[in-house]
Amino acid sequence: MSNKEGSGGFRKRKHDNFPHNQRREGKDVNSSSPVMLAFKSFQQELDARHDKYERLVKLSRDITVESKRTIFLLHRITSAPDMEDILTESEIKLDGVRQKIFQVAQELSGEDMHQFHRAITTGLQEYVEAVSFQHFIKTRSLISMDEINKQLIFTTDDNGKENKTPSSDTQDEQFGTWRLRVTPVDYLLGVADLTGELMRMCINSVGNGDIDTPFEVSQFLRQVYDGFSFIGNTGPYEVSKKLYTLKQSLAKVENACYALKVRGSEIPKHMLADVSSVKTEMIDQEEGIS
């Protein structure tokens, strides 16, 4: 083998032996062939799926933003003179969030939700957090996943507003009913985030001189923590990660209750929040060392 031919000389000579009409680069592509038509249909299907995914991501972002605004509104209850006005306004905001979820349900009509779950999971978790926060303020209890899903049944008659009477799958096809089911993982992650909002509500209540709310929140968080402890590391990875944050929130609430119970009689109410915040910083430092 000469130096000019190099290591690829044999391959080049072998390629030159092919007739010109059999070379790949010289062959015209028939755009109307069955293979090309099949791949064009695949391209259209993938483009439509990607476009749908992007629309769902935008809707999920809107759901997240509106749900956060509802949570911020509900935090004003600790200092507002009339709680009913804020609850009414929060219900209006949640109705707006459900209108966005109705659009998601329409986008997912006839589709496998699990293929697009990653696009909407953030918004659903934030919605669960907002609606469960409102439910706790009203009833001092935890809303169930079934109750949340019942609120996510929509019909064309009321233009997407919640339907109080759940319908069967046959009725869904007959009357044009859409529904979106919150998955157990979305529900658990939303409830885990709820504990952080309850911790903030507890600290704000202490600062406003409310000595009942911290103990109610503390008892509720203990029950939630016990429930998550049963799941432990056997559940989804995201749930086990939230367990540490939940434990921190519970410790801060219990510390606020300690400040109220032990030192409440000797410290003015307007200073209790400062005492609890100092204790909270000490807890964070100890957990960081450990």
Curated annotation (Swiss-Prot):
The keyword Cytoplasm applies. Residues 73-208 are annotated as: Interaction with C1D. Residues 1-32 are annotated as: Disordered. CDD domains: Translin-like (cd14805). It is found in: Cytoplasm, Perinuclear region; Golgi apparatus; Nucleus. One of its GO terms (cellular component) is Golgi apparatus. Mg(2+) binds at E129, E197. There is a cross-link at K279 (Glycyl lysine isopeptide (Lys-Gly) (interchain with G-Cter in SUMO2)). Sumoylated with SUMO1. Residues 16-28 have a biased composition (Basic and acidic residues). One of its GO terms (biological process) is spermatogenesis. The keyword Ubl conjugation applies. Its main location: cytoplasm. Keywords: Cytoplasm, Developmental protein, Differentiation, DNA-binding, Golgi apparatus, Isopeptide bond, Magnesium, Metal-binding, Nucleus, Spermatogenesis, Ubl conjugation. Pfam families: Translin. InterPro entries: Translin_C (IPR016069), Translin_fam (IPR002848), Translin_N (IPR016068), Translin_sf (IPR036081). It comes from the Eukaryota. GO terms for molecular function: metal ion binding; sequence-specific DNA binding. Ring-shaped heterooctamer of six TSN and two TSNAX subunits. Interacts with GOLGA3, TSNAXIP1, SUN1 and AKAP9. Interacts with the homodimeric form of C1D following gamma-radiation. Interacts with TSN and C1D in a mutually exclusive manner. Acts in combination with TSN as an endonuclease involved in the activation of the RNA-induced silencing complex (RISC). Possible role in spermatogenesis. Belongs to the translin family. This is Translin-associated protein X. It comes from Macaca fascicularis (Crab-eating macaque).
